[in-house]
Amino acid sequence: MVVSADPLSSERAEMNILEINQELRSQLAESNQQFRDLKEKFLITQATAYSLANQLKKYKCEEYKDIIDSVLRDELQSMEKLAEKLRQAEELRQYKALVHSQAKELTQLREKLREGRDASRWLNKHLKTLLTPDDPDKSQGQDLREQLAEGHRLAEHLVHKLSPENDEDEDEDEDDKDEEVEKVQESPAPREVQKTEEKEVPQDSLEECAVTCSNSHNPSNSNQPHRSTKITFKEHEVDSALVVESEHPHDEEEEALNIPPENQNDHEEEEGKAPVPPRHHDKSNSYRHREVSFLALDEQKVCSAQDVARDYSNPKWDETSLGFLDTPLARRESVALKGRTRSWQHSSHAN
């Protein structure tokens, strides 16, 4: 035989449970309040006992010495416990700040990783389109350069996003650039050194280089290297003649250079009639004949150089390539050599 539960009894039981639970909660709240009150009273009593113990210690009451020591000992322990709690609270605060900063850094790293994934995804997509072009003409020319530049920019953006210390790297790059600029400013300019070396090159070598370069620009001549070699050799002969002539006294050179072409014969006759300076009387006839023959040889070399230049010239050559044989200096030197040769001949015949 089964007995059915009465619904009214079940409701009463539930109501009793709720009432008992509520009553217990109220009692717990009252107990907590009483505990707080007792704790407060205990702290007040403890503070009062500590102050009284200090006063009794001042008066040196021997009767209450044990009580005073116990109170002071308890107070000292409580102070140590309080200091320990404060120290733990400070450490907890520091740890909390550290955890907060690490959480912030972790958030930034997650953001950087997300941006890095996006950039790598764009770079991968760009490289796929670059390596598999639809149009074959698109893989050449300006389009290829633009795509490569875009890929390079995306790669740099990815590296910049994933680098942990961007600011420090930028500062180091700026310092390196400043050091490079200072080194470049301190080092001598290569162009200035080259200009200084060019100033030290002799004039005859520059003329020789000009002749060789002017000949080398004409590709139609098959015998061009042979001709330039001969002209250079003749130029060396002319230079040697000029150097030997320049070793003579400076006053004779100026007199010979100042002779006009139209009055050359008159001046030669005057030189033949004029008396020989005393220093020429000291020379022997053999030495004069040797010097006259040497000057004649120099004159012959100059004339032969001019003849060679005329023989090897053709309409295709640049007229400026042999300009050094037709310069005013060369003409004046030739006139000076002729005048000096004839003056030596006149002086030798007069003796």
UniProtKB/Swiss-Prot annotation:
UniProt feature, compositional bias: Basic and acidic residues: 192-202, 232-251, 264-273
Highest taxon listed in the record's lineage: Eukaryota
TM ranges: none
Biased composition annotated in UniProt, kind: Low complexity: 214-226
Record key words, sorted: Coiled coil, Cytoplasm
Compartments (UniProt record): Cytoplasm
SS bond list: none
Ranges for domain Olduvai: 174-261
Coiled coil stretches, renumbered: 10-43, 69-115
Tissues/organs with expression: Expressed in brain and medulla.
Cell membrane found in the keyword field: no
UniProt similarity note: Belongs to the NBPF family.
Extra remark: Encoded by one of the numerous copies of NBPF genes clustered in the p36, p12 and q21 region of the chromosome 1.
Protein name, as recorded: Putative NBPF family member NBPF5
Provenance organism: Homo sapiens
